[in-house]
């Protein structure tokens, strides 16, 4: 099985058993995090966060660019972080 096929299979299984739909859209901890996209790092585990706790925005080097500013502005202005 190719990596793509495996990822698609896992995504289908995740979607079929997804039980987080009742969580509100604004994050429970009212925080947004910008983190590096380094695949070795788990920002949720690092910060002790669970699904629904925070908006996590990832990019190369955790650099704040115009894209991150836009995402942070939406997170803060519309969703209360």
Predicted stretch roles:
Residues 1-24:
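N-terminal amphipathic/basic leader segments beginning at the initiator methionine
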Residues 11, 33, 57:
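Divalent metal-coordination and catalytic microenvironments
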Residues 23-28, 47-49, 78:
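Solvent-exposed alpha-helices and their adjacent loops that cap or buttress functional pockets
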Residues 29-31, 53:
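A generic secondary-structure signal marking the coil-to-beta-strand transition
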Residues 35-40, 62-63:
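Short glycine-enriched loops at secondary-structure junctions
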Residues 43-44:
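A short, structured beta-strand/loop element
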Residues 50-81:
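Short HxH-centered metal-ligating active-site micro-motif
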């Amino acid at each position: 099985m190719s990596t793509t096929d495996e990822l698609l299979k896992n995504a289908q299984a995740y979607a079929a058993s997804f039980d987080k739909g009742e969580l509100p859209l604004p994050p429970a901890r009212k925080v947004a995090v910008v983190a590096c996209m380094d695949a070795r790092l788990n920002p949720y585990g690092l910060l002790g966060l669970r699904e629904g706790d925070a908006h996590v925005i990832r990019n190369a080097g955790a650099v704040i660019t115009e894209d991150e500013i836009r995402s942070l502005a939406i997170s803060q202005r519309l969703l209360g972080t």
